[in-house]
Every structure is written in structure tokens, then in C-alpha cells.
Amino acid sequence: MIGNERHGLVGVIGADLIRNAKIPLILLVAVLISAVLVVTTAHRTRLLTAEREQLVLERDALDIEWRNLILEENALGDHSRVESIAIEKLKMQHVDPSQENIVIK
């Protein structure tokens, strides 16, 4: 007698799904896997975007530092240019410390 047997509801539903609904079950698993992959891809994209922003800020800071170094190099180059003009055109020369005269009022 079939009527006297007791089956668990979960077992009956599971057996019915496996027996009659294989394609929808496979599609459900595929959708779940796809959803997990979408979430992980979005997370990685956010992390990479944040890292890229940090690198852009670092690049900008390095660019500003490079420009300041170029300005400093040009300023130091101008000093040597002034010194060479003073020596060549004005016939100026460096004075030894022993030849210096200090005037005090």
C-alpha cells in the first residue's frame, strides 16, 4: 500500500525536481554562478578603479615635483651664467679669505 508510506516533503520535492525539471534546475545553477561572477567582477573593478585614482594622484604629484626640479635646475644654471659673465666681461675674480678687508662703521 502506497498510502501508508511517509515521505519527507524535501525528499519528494528534490526527487520531483531531479526527475521532471532538469533543464530549469541547470539554468538556475547557471544563473546563480553568473550572479556570483558578476558581483566579484564588479568588486574587482571598484578596487582597480580606486588603485588607478591613487596612481593618477601620485603621477600628478611626481609631475609637480619634476616641474619644480626643472625650475630649480634653471635657477641654478642662471647663477653659473651670471658668474661666467662676471668673470669674462667684467673681469671679476674670486677673493681669497686672506685678502678680504672688513669695514666696520
Swiss-Prot record:
GO terms for cellular component: cell division site; plasma membrane. It is a single-pass type II membrane protein. The keyword Phosphoprotein does not apply. Keywords: Cell cycle, Cell division, Cell inner membrane, Cell membrane, Membrane, Transmembrane, Transmembrane helix. It is found in: Cell inner membrane. InterPro entries: Cell_div_FtsL. One of its GO terms (biological process) is FtsZ-dependent cytokinesis. Residues 44-105 are periplasmic. Its main location: membrane. Residues 1-22 are cytoplasmic. The chain crosses the membrane at residues 23-43. Part of a complex composed of FtsB, FtsL and FtsQ. Belongs to the FtsL family. Essential cell division protein. May link together the upstream cell division proteins, which are predominantly cytoplasmic, with the downstream cell division proteins, which are predominantly periplasmic. This is Cell division protein FtsL.
